[in-house]
Amino acid sequence: SGKDGTIRHVFSCVNPQGCNVKSFKSPTEEENLHDFLWRIYAHLPEKRMIQIFNRSHYEDILFPAVHGLIDKKEIQERHEVINKFEEHLQNNNTIILKFYLHISKKEQHKRLEARLTNPEKKWKYNADDKKESKKWSDYMDAYQNVLEGCNKHNPLVIIPADEKWYRN
């Protein structure tokens, strides 16, 4: 969806001393030994700092839901925990802005193909990307569920991201 490029573009004029970026990948073995928000806590911003999450705690609902690793009850519980977590942060003067960069299925396919064929993009390719792209509909359902369940205190803003000029 262009998360890295969007972060670079949007925050290009921000003093880097006041801004941190954390990219969350699949949970590590150690992270899996704790509750799903444990890995997030260490990266919460200090007062007067900007903390950017490239991916976030929402991934800890999406991937497990799509792969049947958690049931509907646990999905609902995670929604509630996230809503309480975000409310707590806001009550302690943390401003939360949430953005979802949405790309179409066609655009996702195009970008995956570019990673395979364009030498400048091959480094981005992950063999799991192709497999995960086949679960497009399941991911869209999971995203819809998160959008409805985790917007209690502040909405997740959906940004059409097929076109870089619009996304950025």
Predicted segment positions?
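Glycine-rich phosphate-binding loop of ATP-dependent small-molecule kinases
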Residues: S1-N168
